[in-house]
Curated annotation (Swiss-Prot):
It is found in: Cell inner membrane. This is NADH-quinone oxidoreductase subunit C. NCBIfam families: PRK06074.1-1 (NF004730). Gene3D superfamilies: NADH:ubiquinone oxidoreductase, 30kDa subunit (3.30.460.80). It is a peripheral membrane protein. InterPro entries: NADH_DH_suC, NADH_quin_OxRdtase_su_C/D-like, NADH_UbQ_OxRdtase_30kDa_su, NADH_UbQ_OxRdtase_CS. The gene is nuoC. The lineage of its organism: Bacteria, Pseudomonadati, Pseudomonadota, Gammaproteobacteria, Thiotrichales. GO terms for cellular component: plasma membrane. HAMAP family: NDH1_NuoC.
Length: 223
Protein backbone atom coordinates (compact mmCIF):
# COMPACT_ATOMS: atom_id res chain seq x y z
CA UNK A 1 0.00 0.00 0.00
CA UNK A 2 1.33 3.39 -0.96
CA UNK A 3 2.25 5.53 2.01
CA UNK A 4 0.66 8.54 0.28
CA UNK A 5 -2.76 6.91 0.62
CA UNK A 6 -2.24 6.41 4.34
CA UNK A 7 -1.04 10.00 4.65
CA UNK A 8 -4.12 11.19 2.78
CA UNK A 9 -6.39 9.19 5.07
CA UNK A 10 -4.75 10.70 8.15
CA UNK A 11 -4.95 14.23 6.73
CA UNK A 12 -8.63 13.89 5.87
CA UNK A 13 -9.44 12.45 9.30
CA UNK A 14 -7.64 15.34 10.97
CA UNK A 15 -9.39 17.91 8.77
CA UNK A 16 -12.95 16.55 8.91
CA UNK A 17 -12.99 15.18 12.45
CA UNK A 18 -16.34 13.84 13.63
CA UNK A 19 -17.93 14.42 10.23
CA UNK A 20 -16.36 11.09 9.24
CA UNK A 21 -18.36 7.96 10.06
CA UNK A 22 -15.69 5.58 8.79
CA UNK A 23 -12.78 5.58 6.34
CA UNK A 24 -11.35 2.57 4.58
CA UNK A 25 -8.57 1.73 2.13
CA UNK A 26 -8.95 -1.11 -0.35
CA UNK A 27 -6.79 -1.70 -3.42
CA UNK A 28 -4.96 1.56 -2.69
CA UNK A 29 -8.23 3.50 -2.93
CA UNK A 30 -9.52 5.61 -0.05
CA UNK A 31 -13.24 5.68 0.70
CA UNK A 32 -14.65 8.04 3.33
CA UNK A 33 -18.20 7.91 4.66
CA UNK A 34 -19.62 11.19 5.95
CA UNK A 35 -22.45 11.90 8.34
CA UNK A 36 -25.33 13.22 6.18
CA UNK A 37 -25.95 16.29 8.34
CA UNK A 38 -22.31 17.37 7.94
CA UNK A 39 -21.75 16.31 4.34
CA UNK A 40 -21.90 19.78 2.76
CA UNK A 41 -19.45 21.40 5.19
CA UNK A 42 -17.10 18.40 4.99
CA UNK A 43 -17.10 18.32 1.19
CA UNK A 44 -16.47 22.06 1.16
CA UNK A 45 -13.39 21.53 3.35
CA UNK A 46 -12.14 18.81 1.01
CA UNK A 47 -12.15 21.34 -1.80
CA UNK A 48 -11.01 24.49 -0.04
CA UNK A 49 -8.51 23.05 2.47
CA UNK A 50 -7.25 19.88 0.81
CA UNK A 51 -7.35 20.92 -2.83
CA UNK A 52 -9.95 18.52 -4.23
CA UNK A 53 -10.95 21.01 -6.89
CA UNK A 54 -12.37 18.51 -9.38
CA UNK A 55 -15.66 16.69 -8.88
CA UNK A 56 -15.40 13.73 -11.25
CA UNK A 57 -18.80 12.18 -10.59
CA UNK A 58 -21.83 12.07 -8.32
CA UNK A 59 -24.00 8.98 -8.48
CA UNK A 60 -26.63 7.11 -6.51
CA UNK A 61 -26.61 3.52 -5.27
CA UNK A 62 -29.57 1.38 -4.20
CA UNK A 63 -28.56 -1.41 -1.81
CA UNK A 64 -31.99 -3.05 -1.75
CA UNK A 65 -31.51 -6.86 -1.84
CA UNK A 66 -27.75 -6.33 -1.79
CA UNK A 67 -26.01 -9.68 -1.43
CA UNK A 68 -29.13 -11.70 -2.31
CA UNK A 69 -29.18 -14.10 -5.24
CA UNK A 70 -32.14 -14.49 -7.57
CA UNK A 71 -32.99 -18.05 -6.54
CA UNK A 72 -32.62 -17.47 -2.81
CA UNK A 73 -35.90 -18.11 -1.00
CA UNK A 74 -37.20 -17.27 2.43
CA UNK A 75 -39.55 -20.28 2.54
CA UNK A 76 -40.16 -23.63 0.85
CA UNK A 77 -41.42 -23.48 -2.73
CA UNK A 78 -43.24 -25.90 -5.00
CA UNK A 79 -42.67 -24.00 -8.24
CA UNK A 80 -39.58 -26.00 -9.21
CA UNK A 81 -37.56 -24.85 -12.19
CA UNK A 82 -40.11 -22.20 -13.12
CA UNK A 83 -38.50 -20.03 -10.46
CA UNK A 84 -35.59 -19.61 -12.87
CA UNK A 85 -37.88 -18.05 -15.49
CA UNK A 86 -40.98 -16.42 -14.07
CA UNK A 87 -41.23 -13.61 -11.60
CA UNK A 88 -41.67 -15.03 -8.10
CA UNK A 89 -42.03 -11.82 -6.11
CA UNK A 90 -45.62 -12.60 -5.15
CA UNK A 91 -44.76 -16.11 -4.00
CA UNK A 92 -41.68 -15.24 -2.00
CA UNK A 93 -42.87 -11.87 -0.73
CA UNK A 94 -41.89 -8.40 -1.83
CA UNK A 95 -38.53 -7.09 -0.66
CA UNK A 96 -38.66 -4.80 2.34
CA UNK A 97 -37.98 -1.35 0.89
CA UNK A 98 -37.75 0.37 4.28
CA UNK A 99 -34.29 -0.92 5.13
CA UNK A 100 -31.64 1.25 6.83
CA UNK A 101 -28.85 2.61 4.65
CA UNK A 102 -30.65 1.59 1.48
CA UNK A 103 -29.47 4.54 -0.60
CA UNK A 104 -26.04 6.09 -0.90
CA UNK A 105 -24.75 9.14 -2.72
CA UNK A 106 -21.18 8.62 -3.95
CA UNK A 107 -18.78 11.43 -4.85
CA UNK A 108 -15.49 10.92 -6.69
CA UNK A 109 -13.05 13.76 -6.08
CA UNK A 110 -9.70 14.58 -7.69
CA UNK A 111 -6.96 16.93 -6.58
CA UNK A 112 -5.11 17.93 -9.74
CA UNK A 113 -2.40 19.78 -7.83
CA UNK A 114 -1.66 16.90 -5.44
CA UNK A 115 -2.55 14.06 -7.82
CA UNK A 116 -4.81 12.40 -5.26
CA UNK A 117 -8.27 10.88 -5.40
CA UNK A 118 -10.88 10.07 -2.79
CA UNK A 119 -14.28 8.44 -2.86
CA UNK A 120 -16.88 9.89 -0.51
CA UNK A 121 -20.13 8.19 0.50
CA UNK A 122 -23.17 9.68 2.21
CA UNK A 123 -26.14 7.57 3.31
CA UNK A 124 -29.40 9.57 3.59
CA UNK A 125 -31.19 8.89 6.87
CA UNK A 126 -34.72 8.67 5.42
CA UNK A 127 -35.05 5.75 3.00
CA UNK A 128 -38.60 6.66 2.01
CA UNK A 129 -37.56 10.16 0.95
CA UNK A 130 -33.75 10.10 0.69
CA UNK A 131 -32.21 13.57 0.80
CA UNK A 132 -28.74 15.07 1.09
CA UNK A 133 -27.45 18.61 0.68
CA UNK A 134 -26.61 19.72 -2.85
CA UNK A 135 -22.98 20.51 -3.63
CA UNK A 136 -23.71 22.71 -6.66
CA UNK A 137 -22.55 25.68 -4.59
CA UNK A 138 -19.18 23.92 -4.17
CA UNK A 139 -18.74 22.41 -7.64
CA UNK A 140 -20.91 23.83 -10.43
CA UNK A 141 -20.59 20.62 -12.43
CA UNK A 142 -22.63 18.78 -9.78
CA UNK A 143 -25.78 20.26 -11.33
CA UNK A 144 -26.51 17.56 -13.92
CA UNK A 145 -24.95 14.79 -11.81
CA UNK A 146 -27.45 15.46 -9.03
CA UNK A 147 -30.34 15.75 -11.47
CA UNK A 148 -29.41 12.33 -12.86
CA UNK A 149 -29.31 10.76 -9.38
CA UNK A 150 -32.70 12.33 -8.65
CA UNK A 151 -34.18 11.11 -11.92
CA UNK A 152 -32.90 7.53 -11.74
CA UNK A 153 -32.90 6.90 -7.96
CA UNK A 154 -35.30 9.48 -6.52
CA UNK A 155 -32.63 10.98 -4.27
CA UNK A 156 -33.41 14.60 -3.37
CA UNK A 157 -30.70 17.25 -3.17
CA UNK A 158 -31.56 20.04 -0.77
CA UNK A 159 -30.61 23.44 -2.17
CA UNK A 160 -30.30 22.37 -5.81
CA UNK A 161 -31.24 25.31 -8.06
CA UNK A 162 -33.22 23.28 -10.62
CA UNK A 163 -33.89 19.73 -9.45
CA UNK A 164 -35.90 18.08 -12.23
CA UNK A 165 -35.62 15.00 -14.40
CA UNK A 166 -32.88 14.93 -17.00
CA UNK A 167 -32.97 11.51 -18.73
CA UNK A 168 -36.48 10.05 -18.56
CA UNK A 169 -39.49 11.13 -20.61
CA UNK A 170 -41.98 13.82 -19.63
CA UNK A 171 -44.53 12.46 -17.17
CA UNK A 172 -42.39 9.43 -16.32
CA UNK A 173 -43.51 7.74 -13.11
CA UNK A 174 -40.96 6.19 -10.77
CA UNK A 175 -37.18 5.97 -10.75
CA UNK A 176 -35.83 3.27 -13.11
CA UNK A 177 -32.54 2.40 -11.37
CA UNK A 178 -34.19 1.56 -8.07
CA UNK A 179 -33.98 -2.17 -7.39
CA UNK A 180 -37.75 -2.42 -6.85
CA UNK A 181 -38.51 -0.84 -10.25
CA UNK A 182 -39.57 -3.63 -12.66
CA UNK A 183 -37.13 -4.41 -15.45
CA UNK A 184 -40.00 -4.25 -17.96
CA UNK A 185 -41.16 -0.86 -16.70
CA UNK A 186 -44.77 0.15 -16.10
CA UNK A 187 -45.86 1.56 -19.47
CA UNK A 188 -44.91 1.20 -23.13
CA UNK A 189 -45.35 3.67 -25.96
CA UNK A 190 -46.29 3.23 -29.61
CA UNK A 191 -47.53 5.31 -32.51
CA UNK A 192 -51.30 5.09 -33.03
CA UNK A 193 -52.08 5.71 -36.72
CA UNK A 194 -55.77 6.34 -36.05
CA UNK A 195 -55.10 8.95 -33.38
CA UNK A 196 -52.09 10.32 -35.24
CA UNK A 197 -49.94 10.48 -32.13
CA UNK A 198 -47.87 8.47 -29.71
CA UNK A 199 -49.90 6.73 -27.01
CA UNK A 200 -48.89 5.23 -23.67
CA UNK A 201 -50.33 1.89 -22.55
CA UNK A 202 -49.73 -0.55 -19.69
CA UNK A 203 -46.74 -2.74 -20.43
CA UNK A 204 -47.54 -6.08 -22.08
CA UNK A 205 -44.11 -7.67 -21.66
CA UNK A 206 -44.04 -10.52 -19.16
CA UNK A 207 -41.71 -9.90 -16.25
CA UNK A 208 -39.36 -12.90 -16.11
CA UNK A 209 -35.83 -13.80 -15.07
CA UNK A 210 -33.65 -14.71 -18.05
CA UNK A 211 -30.26 -14.37 -16.36
CA UNK A 212 -30.45 -15.00 -12.59
CA UNK A 213 -28.18 -12.98 -10.34
CA UNK A 214 -25.46 -15.18 -8.84
CA UNK A 215 -22.93 -14.00 -6.26
CA UNK A 216 -19.59 -15.78 -6.26
CA UNK A 217 -17.59 -15.89 -3.06
CA UNK A 218 -14.77 -18.08 -4.35
CA UNK A 219 -12.84 -15.26 -6.02
CA UNK A 220 -11.08 -12.73 -3.81
CA UNK A 221 -9.69 -9.46 -5.23
CA UNK A 222 -5.95 -9.08 -5.21
CA UNK A 223 -4.32 -6.45 -3.04
Amino acid sequence: MKQSVLDLQATIQETLGDAIVVSDIKLDELTVELAPEQSLSALTKLKEKLGFDQLIDVCGVDYLAFGDVTWETRKATNSGFSRGVFDFAEEDGEADTNIPRRFAVVYHLLSVENNRRVRVKVYPEDTQMPMVDSVVSVWNCADWFEREAFDLFGILFNGHPDLRRILTDYGFVGHPLRKDFPLTGHVEMRYDAEKGRVVYEPVTIENRVNVPRVIRNDVEPKG
